[in-house]
A protein has these predicted regions:
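Active-site core of glycosidic bond-cleaving carbohydrate-active enzymes
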Residues: 1-256
């Protein structure tokens, strides 16, 4: 808890006046850009700490930073009530990435808009805990959800399904979860998710009636899986699903 409190204080201190959050905190690199999911740590991390420890002070100390981040998105987007036009990492290292790309094939604007909604909702929740007036964010959140549903009525990748269901953005979240289960099954009970979709994958499957499928993914040892790195002697989390490849080769040093 103490580590993350300190890190979040660094994030707030390094946050730009317009709410921009660099993708490395402390901000030791030059010419950084904000990216959906990365910058959303300004809202996600305080809320997760609050859920873990129940201490309102973490929300109180980060509340202005949380609001500034949502304000940054609102002021920088090219489409009202969505987050479009930015440059993002997308579903980084998703296994459905086009040839020659590190970004998974999920729609980057969909990912960004999903996290816009999520961070706005977290500001609402934090404000309610703190007794703050969050009516502005309640209206914004409703508008984002409506725009999201109009713009993306169907989902084509595992990560798109995951975000639509987990953040309750789809008109029919069960249908989005059903599509996710089909995509996983059709892939040979394999995940294709990257940085964005992976943390929520098993939650969505479990929450929407696919517990057995979630267990099959979790306990899988062949690449790609959570246990595959352990079979190769890993003691930390790799950036790539195959930091050591099946033939024993390593990724280049810029990645691991």
């Amino acid at each position: 808890e103490a580590f993350y409190r300190k890190w979040l204080s660094d994030l707030a201190a390094d946050q730009y006046p317009d709410g921009h959050v660099d993708h490395v905190i402390p901000a030791i690199l030059e010419n950084q850009k904000s990216s959906a999911a990365w910058g959303d740590a300004a809202c996600v991390c305080p809320w997760e700490l609050y859920l873990a420890f129940g201490d309102e002070n973490i929300l109180r100390s980060q509340f202005n930073s949380m609001k500034k981040w949502v304000g940054y998105i609102t002021s920088s987007t090219t489409t009202k009530n969505l987050w479009t036009g930015g440059e993002h990492y997308g579903d980084w290292l998703g296994l459905d990435a086009p040839s020659g790309s590190y970004k998974g094939s999920s729609d980057e604007d969909l990912i960004a808009s999903a996290f816009y909604a999520h961070s706005t909702e977290l500001v609402m929740k934090a404000g309610n805990v703190l007794g703050e007036d969050v009516s502005e964010y309640e209206t914004l959140y409703k508008n984002i959800v409506a725009a999201f549903q109009e713009t993306w009525p169907v989902y084509h990748t595992q990560t798109e399904c995951i975000l639509a269901a987990h953040f309750h953005l789809a008109k029919d979240c069960q249908a989005a979860a059903d599509q996710l289960a089909k995509l996983v099954t059709d892939a040979g009970v394999q995940l294709k998710t990257g940085f964005v979709g992976t943390p929520y994958l098993l939650h969505v499957l479990s929450d929407y009636g696919y517990v057995s499928l979630a267990w099959s993914l979790l306990l899988r040892e062949n690449y790609p899986s959570w246990l595959y790195p352990i079979t190769k002697g890993a003691t930390t989390i790799w950036e790539h699903w195959d930091g050591i490849m099946e033939n024993g080769d390593f990724w280049t040093r810029d990645m691991n």
